[in-house]
Structures are given as C-alpha cells and as structure tokens.
C-alpha cells in the first residue's frame, strides 16, 4: 500500500485558497441540471464525489461544458425532472452527496434506474429516505440488502404528506427538499426524531432559493414545499470554499502558527462548518473573520467538552487537535460519525491510541486524553479522506507520522498534502 511520511513541522504560516465546497458543488450541479436556463458554476470542486455526480448527469442526458481544470462548469438545464431514455445503471462510488439527492430526484416522472456504488456505499443506510419517498408514491426496490443501496427506482413520487427520520443523516431531508418542488402536488415533510447536522439543511435551502424556490420552514420540524414548480437558473453561481477542508489548516494555525488564513469562505458563509473556528477560539486560539477569509493564530490550547452535532465533519479535526490541548477533550452527540465514509468513531479511537492517546469510545461520543509526547505510528485511513487529513496534524509535533493510502484525500481535496507543505516549515 502506498504511504506518505510527514516529517515534524516546526511552524505553519501563510494563505490557502480553498477548493470549492463538496456539499455546495453537488447540490448546485443537480439544481442547475433541473433548472430552466444555463448556469455557469465557478470554483466547482474537482474531486471524486463531484466526478460521480457529473458522470451521472451526463448519463442522464444533461449537457454541460467543463473547463480543463474542471472548476468551471456550464450546465444546460433540462427545465424539469431528469428523464433517462431507457433503463440505466449509475455507479456513484462512495459519494453520499450524489447517491441521496439523485435517489430522490430520479423518483420524479417515470424512470427505470439502478443506483449503485462501492462496497462501502452498500453499508451506508438509505432506508429513511426510501421510506419517505415511498410515502410520496415512489416505486423503489432494494436489490441486495434491505435499507441499503443498490436501489432500483421506477418513478412515481407525487408529493403529499411524508415523514422522514432526521436522526441519522441530514442528506435524506436535503434529497427530499430538492426533489419536492418538481412533484405534481405540494409536499409537507415532517421530521421524526432529532434533526442532525442542521446547518447542512441551511445550505440546501439557500441553494434552492438561489435557484428560485422558497420553502416554508417551520422550526426545522415541518417543511412545506409547493409542487409543480420550476427551478430557474441564477445565471452565474460562485461555489464557496469548502469549510470542512478549511478546518485542517485553521487547526494547524492554532497548534503551530504563525497565522494561517483560508480564503473562499468568510463570516457570511452558507456552510455551518465555519463554526469550527469558534471551537478553536474556545480552545484558546485567536481567530479573525473577513468577508472572504478566516484566519487562525496560535494560542495555548485547552481541552473542551462540547456537543458537535452541528459540525460532524469538522469535529473530526478537533479530535486530532485535542492531542495538542491541555486536559481531556470530549466530543458528544456524534453518532452519525458511524455511518460516514467509514465508522469514524471506531477509526478515530483506534488511530488516536496508536499515537499514544488515552481514548474512550462511546456509542455517540469520544473522550481523548493526549500523551506527554506523541508516538510515531502508521495511520490507517480506512479509505476515508478525513482520516488522512486529520492525522496529518500529528506532524505538528516533534514526531513524524506515516499516512497510509494518502491519495484517499481525492474524495474532496486531491492536493491537500501539497497545500499543507506549502505553508509548513520543517523542524
């Protein structure tokens, strides 16, 4: 297996221009495809997950022109539901941001489409979304295991009253919201259980509004979406930088700055993961905000005990930043780590112990006490981009670290290690 050994980093300082947000890129691509008119997306993320969405749209007959660096995309909208000419199978890798929204969008009209993906995708639950779509009339079959992809979709979603469980993934609600305006009837979506990762719903609502569709949001408990609508292209849309990707550089600044500035997001960002910077501030770092940047300067870091449900992806970065904080850090209410690219609670606990931390892994929390000195380790990445990026922070100590399968960062950030090296001074 390929590996990358990072030598100890004495200091980080500089500016990182963030690649486009994965969450925003894939939502914007789908809405642009469904909309009337042509949309030019700029700062689109070039990564595996976005390529899976682009390939699927292409197979569905959507016409787009992609620039040579794949960050500008001109999409010719279809002005309504996506219709496949014939029976089709779409392979979506391990891209939840393609699988879930497409599963809903392709239940509009009359298609015969199979959605499948990598082995791990077949372990990521989708039953709550399927249940909700079926309540709205969709014809969906599980081809292998009940409640998991691959799925066969044969249209039929007409709207009406649907209830969706919000406790596992906000992507199920996102998928329903984006498809519902194109259903023939109004859709009333009721949330069952606690809605996790709520800020991701705000991204969805913001993008729908950008494409001309407003949703009545009743305190995140009920959402009313008028049917028979059409998305309208906004013309041009700039995809903001990826706030989850920003977390590694901001944390590096907190641990070994200097000052690290990330551009492409700022105080008015639509992504909830910018709140990650508040957590670093709480731990003792200095954070400054601009319209188009966030900067983080080193501070004496202290442990925290916090509910991280609002920023599950960025919270992983706090788990490795905790290695550099005084005291025991507890991250709570993160059960949904278990249903991501890998079981992230198990993976994080296992790898943190390798570098010498004392770790308690709960069903939905993790408690981390750092060692006096970090130990050298080979870090398994579980084909999970965030594991690779999180554990690169170990090099901000006096100890090198080896990352196995470093190319798994291609899911969201192909040039991550290059960007980290650019702002690093080796010990």
Curated annotation (Swiss-Prot):
Signal peptide: none annotated. Phosphoenolpyruvate binds at residues 22, 96, 124, 171, 344, 386, 411. Its EC number is 2.5.1.19. It catalyses: 3-phosphoshikimate + phosphoenolpyruvate = 5-O-(1-carboxyvinyl)-3-phosphoshikimate + phosphate. Pathway: Metabolic intermediate biosynthesis; chorismate biosynthesis; chorismate from D-erythrose 4-phosphate and phosphoenolpyruvate: step 6/7. InterPro entries: Enolpyruvate_Tfrase_dom, Enolpyruvate_Tfrase_sf, EPSP_synthase, EPSP_synthase_CS, RNA3'P_cycl/enolpyr_Trfase_a/b. The active site is at residue 313. Keywords: Amino-acid biosynthesis, Aromatic amino acid biosynthesis, Cytoplasm, Herbicide resistance, Transferase. This is 3-phosphoshikimate 1-carboxyvinyltransferase. It comes from Klebsiella pneumoniae.
